[in-house]
A protein has these predicted regions:
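Ser/Thr-rich, low-complexity intrinsically disordered terminal regions
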Residues: 41, 46-109, 193-252, 271
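Beta-strand/loop substructures that line and gate deep hydrophobic ligand-binding cavities in soluble
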Residues: 101, 107-133, 250-277
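C-terminal motif of bacterial Sec signal peptides marking the signal peptidase cleavage site
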Residues: 6-9
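Solvent-exposed, acidic/flexible segments
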Residues: 37-45, 62, 100-101, 113, ...
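Bacterial signal peptide processing site
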Residues: 11-14
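Terminal, regulation- and interaction-focused segments at domain boundaries
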Residues: 16-70, 159-203
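C-terminal partner/receptor-binding element of secreted or periplasmic proteins
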Residues: 125-163, 269-302
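Sec-dependent N-terminal signal peptides
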Residues: 1-3
């Protein structure tokens, strides 16, 4: 199994090959924390939501991958993504680089294997920082502590394991970007409205700047829009269940230090590589086309 994950400001959506490198744990993507969570799938999903709320965060949305896949005519084992976390824990990373918002709030994937066992997977704080190009270890501490608290409450008992290594994870060409002609609010709304046309749909919109009213400096306007394409997502979830951690797709919209609105979205080919899916898979091509179209539409280019 091999991998290359990459992040930057102005990558070409059509350029570059994905180089892959071995990872150490089968079924566990680079830069993640994976816990065994017993055999009760529904209770685990509920405990994750409660843990987020009880540790000072909020649940943004819950995505039932299995239900969405079923609606698309594909049967997969139970798989649910819980998106949410503490706004305060995100701020140190966002203050250094708003592109970190492409992987915030945290995403917790609960899935059940064919043997009935339930697992819980989440990105490590080191991964979120790495793909955003934030080298400062101190900026990751709040997110790491918050994630550990959620995991410890959702799956009580065993200590939270060490994250898998950041094999092949770099901040180069991970985030594709397009400059928008409008404000952050207008651009995010364009994204949402554009996504609500078949085959895509908007799943959630998060104002990440809203949580910055603490003693530290406020961050510039930053929003994230989550977008699903069930027809393309479902076959990928069936072939590579761990990719549920990175679906639905997300778009971060922010005001940069030159007062320009930017739209950034992870290159889905890099996401595919992280989960062992071929970059030329037709469903990956469909998601890439969706993302490019929506970004250009929101930017006012088309």
């Amino acid at each position: 199994m091999t991998l290359a994950v990459v992040a930057s400001g102005c990558a070409n959506p059509t350029g570059g090959e994905v180089s892959l490198e071995p990872r150490t744990a089968p079924g566990q993507p680079a830069g993640t924390i994976l816990l065994a969570a017993g055999t009760d799938f529904a209770s685990t999903v509920q405990r994750v939501q409660e843990a987020i709320s009880e540790t000072g965060g909020s649940v943004t949305t819950v995505v039932d991958h299995a239900a969405d896949a079923r609606a698309a005519g594909v049967a997969i084992p139970p798989s649910t993504l819980v998106i949410g976390g503490s706004p305060a824990a995100q701020l140190p990373l966002l203050r250094i680089d708003q592109r970190a918002g492409a992987n915030l709030p945290q995403r917790y994937l609960v899935r059940q294997g064919s043997d009935g066992s339930v697992s819980l997977t989440v990105d490590s704080a080191d991964y979120v920082a790495a793909v955003a190009g934030v080298p400062d270890p101190g900026a990751r501490t709040a997110l790491r502590d918050s994630t550990t608290a959620v995991l410890g409450q959702a799956v009580p008992g065993p200590p939270v394991p060490v994250p898998s290594p950041l094999v092949g994870v770099t901040p180069s060409n991970y985030l594709l970007t397009v400059a928008s002609s409008a404000s952050v609010a207008t651009t995010a709304d364009r994204l949402r409205r554009g996504a609500d046309r078949r085959p895509t749909r908007s799943v959630a919109v998060v104002d990440e700047a809203a949580g910055s009213a603490d003693p530290g400096p406020a961050i510039r306007p930053t929003s994230v829009v989550f977008v699903s394409d069930a027809q393309a997502d479902a076959p990928l979830l069936a072939a590579a269940p761990s990719i549920g951690l990175d679906l639905p797709q997300r778009f971060v919209v922010w005001l940069d230090d030159q007062n320009r609105t930017q739209i950034g979205y992870p290159d889905v080919r890099r996401i595919a590589a992280r989960h062992g899916v071929a970059a030329d898979d037709p469903n990956i091509a469909q998601l890439a086309a969706d993302a490019d179209r929506l970004a250009r539409l929101a930017a006012g280019i088309i």
